[in-house]
Amino acid sequence: MHRASANSPLNSVSGSMMWRNQSSGRRPSKRLSDNEATLSTINSILGAEDMLSKNLLSYLPPNNEEIDMIYPSEQIMTFIEMLHGHKNFFKGQTIHNALRDSAVLKKQIAYGVAQALLNSVSIQQIHDEWKRHVRSFPFHNKKLSFQDYFSVWAHAIKQVILGDISNIINFILQSIDNSHYNRYVDWICTVGIVPFMRTTPTAPNLYNLLQQVSSKLIHDIVRHKQNIVTPILLGLSSVIIPDFHNIKIFRDRNSEQISCFKNKKAIAFFTYSTPYVIRNRLMLTTPLAHLSPELKKHNSLRRHQKMCQLLNTFPIKVLTAAKTDVTNKKIMDMIEKEEKNSDAKKSLIKFLLNLSDSKSKIGIRDSVEGFIQEITPSIIDQNKLMLNRGQFRKRSAIDTGERDVRDLFKKQIIKCMEEQIQTQMDEIETLKTTNQMFERKIKDLHSLLETNNDCDRYNPDLDHDLENLSLSRALNIVQRLPFTSVSIDDTRSVANSFFSQYIPDTQYADKRIDQLWEMEYMRTFRLRKNVNNQGQEESITYSNYSIELLIVPFLRRLLNIYNLESIPEEFLFLSLGEILLAIYESSKIKHYLRLVYVRELNQISEVYNLTQTHPENNEPIFDSNIFSPNPENEILEKIKRIRNLRRIQHLTRPNYPKGDQD
C-alpha cells in the first residue's frame, strides 16, 4: 500500500502562506485578499488530487497489452459461485464454511485479551484487594477458621475478576463484523489478494468500556493496559473488507506491481498468495485455482448427465428407416398409373424389367416383340406376322427382312440408352450445382441461428440453468439442440441407440472431486479432521497451523493488532466461559493468592498466638488444598484430554513486520 508523502502540496502551500503573513508588512485588507487567494489555490490543488485519485483508471492504457487483469474474471466468478452453492453442491463448500467460521477469530481475541489482562495483575493489587476486604469484614477467629475466611474471599474475587473480564470481552466482540472475516477467507481462497479500506479511526470511548467493570482491580488493569484494548477497538472499527462488487485488481506487466481499485479509487490490499506469470499467462496460486481443471471436468460430466436425463425423458424413442420391399410389379403399376402413353424411356425401362422377369426363350421373345410394337410398330415385318401373305416369297427375302428388324431394334435401343444417359448426366450436373448452392445457404442460416435466433441454446449459463429450471421449460430448451439424421445402408445395422433411458453415472466423479477438494483445503490450511472411534468424521476445525496461517495475518496485517498471544488449538473446543476459567487457573493470580494466604496466616498466628493446628478439631490451619485442584479445575483436565486425544502440536508464531506491506 502506498503511503502519502509528508511533503504534500498542502503542507508546502500552507508553510509559504504562514511565512508571507509573518514577514510581510501589508495592510489587513490586502493580507485578507492574499489569504483568500491562497485558500482558493489550496482548494484547487486538493480538488486536482482528489480527481486524480478517483479517475486513476482513466490513465491506464486503453488496451490490455500492458496489464494483466486479475479480478474480475470469468474463472474467479465461477469460483465464487461454486463456493456458495449457486449452481451445484460440493463437499468442499462445507469445508470452506468451516474455514470461514468467525467464532475462531472471536475466541482468539477473547483468549488474547483475557491472557493479557489476567497476567497483568500484580501482587500489590491482590494485596490491596485483600486489605480492602479485611477492613470491611475483619477476621475475629470465632468458630471460623482462617482457611474458610480466606477461601470465601478468594472465590469471590475470582468470580468478580472473571465476570468483569467477560463483560469487557463481550463489549469488544460486539464490534466484530462477521462478514469481514468471511470475505477475507473468500478472497484468499479465490484470488489470493485481499482488498481492504481504512476509515478514519476514532478514539475508542473507554468510558463505555469501563462501565462494564464493577471492581476497582479490573478498572485499574484496563487503564494500565490501554495498549492492549485500544488497538483492538481501533482495528475492528477502522478496517472494511469489501465484497466482490466494483473491485478491480490488475498487475502491471512492466513494473510487475499489483494495484487494487474500488469504484475507480485506489485502495489498500494484502497479498496472501502472489500470482505467477507463466508463458505470458497469469496463473493464480489459490486452492480454487489448483482445483480448477478438475472442477471443469466434473461440471462437464454433470451437464452431460443432466442433458441426457432431459433428452431421454420421453417414454419411447424410435429410429425409422425405409424398408426395401418394392417389387418390379409395383414399379410397373406405378408407371402405368402415372401415364398411360409411355414415352421411349419408360418403354425401355418396362422392357428391361420384363426381360429380368422372363425365365424362358418364349418370355424373352414376347418381351422383345412387345417393346418393338410399342415404340415403333412400323418396323415389324408384317410378312412374318401374317404368314398367309408371305408364304410364297423367297427365303432370302425373309432373311433380309429379319436382319433389317434386328438392325432397327438395335439402333432404337442404343438411341434410347444414349438419350437416357445424356439426360441423366445433365440432371446430375444440375443437381450438383444446386446442391452446392443450398449447402452454402444452409451454412449461412446455421450461422445466423447460432448468433441471433437461438440465444438460449448458446447461452454459456444454459448448462447450469438446466439444474434449476422446471422440467417442462428445461425440456423445451433441450429440444432445440440439433440432431443429425443418418441414413443406413442395406448392408449395415444399428449397433447402439437410445431405445431405453441412458444417464451417465457421476457417483465416482462426485466422490473423487470431494476427495480432491478436501485434500486441497486440509493440506493448504492445515485443517484438522476430527473423527470418532469408528473413524467417522465429526467435524473439521482449525489447527495451530491454521491459526498462524489465517488468524494471525488477519490481526497483524489488516487490523494492526500485534500484542495478542495465539490461542492454543485445544482451547478452540471450549466455550468462552471455559476459556476464561482455564486462563485464570493457569495464571499467576493463583500464586499471588497463595502467597497472600501464607503471609496473612503467619501474621494472624502471631496476633492470636495460634499454633499450626485448629484449636477445636486439631486440623492444620494451613491447608494447601485451598489451591490444589478442585472441581473447577476439571477444565484443565479437559484441556489435557483434548490435547492427548487430538495429538496437538504447538509451534512458534512467526514475527510479521509492523505496518502495512502489500
Swiss-Prot record:
It comes from Human herpesvirus 6B (strain Z29). Its main location: virion. Belongs to the herpesviridae portal protein family. Forms a portal in the viral capsid through which viral DNA is translocated during DNA packaging. Assembles as a dodecamer at a single fivefold axe of the T=16 icosahedric capsid. Binds to the molecular motor that translocates the viral DNA, termed terminase. This is Portal protein. The lineage of its organism: Viruses, Duplodnaviria, Heunggongvirae, Peploviricota, Herviviricetes. Keywords: Host nucleus, Viral genome packaging, Viral release from host cell, Virion. Homododecamerizes. Interacts with terminase subunits TRM1 and TRM3. Residues 1-26 have a biased composition (Polar residues).
